[in-house]
Amino acid sequence: MHNLNSFIQNNNLICWVIGFQIFRFLILPFVGLMPQDAYYFLYGQNLSLSYFDHPGMIGYLLRLFSEIFGKSVFVIKLTDFTITTCTILAFYKLASYFLSEKKLERALILITTTLFLSILSFNSTPDVPLLLFWTLSLICLYKAVFEDKKWFWIFAGIAMGLAFNSKYTALLLQFGLISFLIFSNKYRKLFGSPWLWFSILISILVMFPVFLWNYHHDFASFTFQSSERTSSISEFKISPTNFFGAIAHQLLLLLPVLFLVIITFTLKYIKKAVLKF
């Protein structure tokens, strides 16, 4: 008991994070089935190399959990919760490479308390595995590039491929890696390393089933996510209401703590200005 009290006193912020996750876990049985949950659960029950609107990673993971724990709404929610918890742990590891211990704890609190992360803990979407494999990709690339650990090029290739198999936006990982090396005087020399190209080749091989499915289905998914989505964007009209509404929406979803801080300081500033007037 003394050791537990000592841990809590020395790791207040970490305990807050654990408390958030315990709370989320306890309410899992009371969260109902959402349309997205049922939709992507059917992915896993009808296995394919890919699907019309997204690759199938979320469906595969739902199938894996249902095979182990059975088919139920709770198991679907447990899948999302488990993957999101792994994402938090991966984020903590990644952030530890860049931040001091104090800033690391604050960063962990910020990401854990985001409304967006709470939604992902209870709602099956391609973003659930995307965030995990994206974060793992960055961890492996950090090890490979900055610490010159060759084997992590292989792990990075696998992680980048699995991220793409979660959602197409993960293709930006490879582009981001190449762009970073182009603009980095220190690490541009890695273009001459076979490990870089081996990593990219591995990622392409992991992604290959998605390309194969698209090839056999007239590239239906790629077309849907590119030209059709682009045409809908072209119809969008910018207005002040939409602009500021979008900013507020992102702040609320991604950084609610920071959002509340901004509101608090803004109100204090307005009150102070009014009193001075």
Show where each model-derived region lies:
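Membrane-interface transmembrane helices that cradle and orient dolichyl/undecaprenyl
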Residues: 96-101, 137-152, 264-268
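Transmembrane-helix motifs of polytopic, lipid-linked glycan transferases
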Residues: 14, 78-100, 113, 136-140
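Extracytoplasmic catalytic/substrate-binding loops of multi-pass membrane glycan-assembly enzymes
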Residues: 27-41, 50-62, 70-74
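Short acidic/glycine- and proline-prone juxtamembrane loop motifs at membrane-interface regions
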Residues: 35, 116-130
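Membrane-interface alpha helices of multi-pass inner-membrane proteins
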Residues: 152-167, 203-205
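Transmembrane-lumen/periplasm boundary regions of multi-pass, lipid-linked membrane glycan transferases
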Residues: 174-275
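Specific aromatic-rich, kink-prone transmembrane helix
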Residues: 45, 88, 129-146, 152-160
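Short helix- or helix-capping micro-motifs
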Residues: 17, 107-115, 160, 164
